[in-house]
């Protein structure tokens, strides 16, 4: 048996690559450099890697020529290179949308009769179709809302945080189920769901804030019953969907015996630092829960003076650190943006 060792070193703006081949030898009991394999010892299963398909991604994709589209899709979802096998898609608009929008903004439409999937069909599905064709099979989708429709919120706006009004909690649960069904009725594999992107953050873009108790009530009394009524309980629900350093506190306060069987995992972001110990604590305290990084990107405002390769090193650092502590998968943010890091409702950031 042979071991191939690949090393890429970046130092003083110089890239050096090495490849070494080592022959395995029988273990003769000597104290030496050795690789021990213990088949009975297992760690976490790796669910896979992927990225987000937002309206911004779809808009840029629509402006590319066919050759550019094929090259991009092949690099991400082909079998030889990055091998992406998951995607994250926003429910309604997010910060990386062409404009604010809602599938149904009619406050009087209690039965969602005016629900429109046209924006998803225009911007999201062409990218998803190309990805699945390249991948060779259906790609598991994680859906995440940034905000309920404006009329359902106390501040009557999609942005600037605000809270979901209790009287609309049931309707918001039905709205989420409708989104899932729109995808599934077209044959797409919605497999994962988070209840709210960054539930502690009051953002100048689409956002909505919850406490752990509020989210627990929403899940237990509204969302899960709605999923059950629509035969959608096979979907994996992920808690949190925010930065790593507060993940354990949120899960500890929210998770109890009443909702334990409703929850499959915890979704985390990377924007506040490494916090690899937070991943380890989650895995130690809740070993049955999966841990996915659901969003990560390099923000221009923080890293504008470093090279592209240095940014790649940040990804490698985060991936290795998280996987070593028990992470099950990684979803990058936008897989494609324009040269200005958009389109975006407020600011820009680079895509991989």
Task: Identify the role of each PLM range.
Residues 19-190:
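N-terminal catalytic cores of secreted or lumenal carbohydrate-active enzymes
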Residues 48-53, 85-90, 140-143, 191-195, ...:
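Structural recognition of the beta-strand scaffold that forms the well-ordered cores
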Residues 185-186, 206-299:
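Active-site neighborhood of glycoside hydrolase catalytic domains
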Residues 96-100, 149-156, 200-204, 247-249, ...:
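Short acidic/His/Gly/Ser-rich catalytic and metal-binding motifs that mark active-site loops
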Residues 268-340:
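Catalytic-core region of carbohydrate-active enzymes that cleave or remodel glycosidic bonds
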Residues 347-352:
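Conserved small/polar residues in nucleotide/adenosyl-binding loops
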Residues 146-158, 191-215:
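Active-site-proximal loop/short-helix segments
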């Amino acid at each position: 048996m042979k071991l191939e060792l690949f090393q890429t070193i970046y130092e003083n703006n110089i890239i050096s690559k090495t490849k070494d081949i080592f022959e395995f030898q029988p273990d003769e009991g000597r104290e030496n450099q050795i690789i021990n394999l213990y088949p009975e010892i297992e760690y976490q299963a790796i669910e896979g890697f992927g990225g987000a398909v937002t309206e911004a991604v779809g808009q840029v994709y629509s402006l590319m020529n066919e050759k550019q589209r094929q090259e991009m899709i092949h690099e991400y979802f082909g079998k030889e290179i990055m091998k992406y096998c998951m995607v994250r898609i926003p429910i309604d608009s997010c910060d990386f949308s062409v404009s604010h929008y809602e599938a149904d903004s009619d406050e009087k439409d209690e039965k969602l009769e005016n629900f429109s999937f046209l924006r998803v069909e225009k911007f999201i599905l062409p990218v998803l179709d190309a990805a699945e064709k390249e991948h060779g099979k259906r790609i598991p989708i994680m859906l995440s809302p940034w905000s309920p429709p404006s009329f359902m919120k106390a501040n009557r706006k999609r942005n600037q945080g605000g809270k979901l009004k209790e009287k609309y909690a049931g309707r918001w649960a039905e709205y989420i189920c409708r989104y899932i069904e729109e995808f599934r009725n077209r044959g797409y594999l919605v497999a994962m769901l988070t209840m709210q992107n960054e539930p502690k953050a009051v953002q100048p873009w689409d956002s909505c804030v919850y406490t752990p108790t509020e989210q627990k009530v929403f899940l237990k009394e509204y969302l899960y019953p709605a999923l059950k009524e629509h035969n959608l309980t096979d979907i994996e629900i992920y808690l949190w969907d925010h930065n790593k350093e507060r993940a354990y506190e949120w899960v500890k306060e929210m998770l109890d015996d009443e909702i334990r069987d409703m929850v499959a995992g915890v979704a985390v972001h990377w924007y506040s630092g490494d916090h690899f110990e937070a991943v380890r604590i989650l895995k130690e305290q809740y070993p049955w829960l999966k841990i996915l990084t659901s969003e990560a990107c390099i923000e221009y405002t923080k890293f504008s003076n470093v090279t592209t390769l240095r940014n790649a090193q940040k990804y490698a650092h985060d991936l290795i650190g998280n996987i070593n502590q028990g992470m099950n998968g990684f979803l990058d943010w936008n897989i494609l943006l324009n040269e200005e890091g958009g389109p975006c409702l407020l600011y820009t950031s680079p895509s991989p």
